[in-house]
């Protein structure tokens, strides 16, 4: 059975430093598990690891998404699982590092893996609810009686 290592803790607790030390000892690569560090262009506000922090160790799923494109915990967990397999296929140890409890739960226990809400549709449904909640409920029951 192939294994991976997970480091979870609060902000500024030394997770990144520890993950790099362990990656060097275990011949590993680091996968981010942070709900904000996924976004590009906000590295300072999210404490994304710098090149210096990474110290030559490959890091994955940091700063890869535009902030205008939300990501669900389920979608993120799917990406992490893919990275784990890729790293293990290369004979290395995946080290999952971060502090996002919901993302960790999605990874270990499962969660809806669909994309985030369709915001225009959500807006229309919210307006329909405000206009006539009973009519919306009846409409929903016609689609899904349960």
Sequence positions of predicted segments:
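Phosphate/pyrophosphate-binding catalytic cores of soluble transferases and nucleic-acid-acting enzymes
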Residues: 1-146
């Amino acid at each position: 059975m192939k294994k991976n290592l997970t480091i979870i803790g609060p902000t500024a607790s030394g997770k990144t430093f520890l993950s790099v030390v362990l990656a060097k000892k275990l011949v590993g690569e680091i996968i981010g598990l942070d709900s904000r560090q996924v976004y590009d262009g906000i590295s300072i506000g999210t404490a994304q690891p710098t090149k210096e922090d990474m110290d030559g160790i490959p890091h994955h799923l940091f700063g890869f998404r535009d902030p205008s494109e939300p990501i669900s915990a389920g979608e993120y967990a799917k990406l992490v699982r893919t990275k784990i397999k890729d790293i293990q296929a290369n004979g290395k140890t995946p080290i999952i590092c971060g502090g996002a409890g919901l993302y960790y739960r999605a990874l270990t226990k499962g969660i809806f893996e669909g994309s985030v809400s369709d915001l225009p549709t959500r807006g229309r449904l919210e307006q329909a609810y405000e206009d006539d909640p009973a009519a919306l409920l009846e409409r929903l029951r016609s689609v899904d009686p349960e």
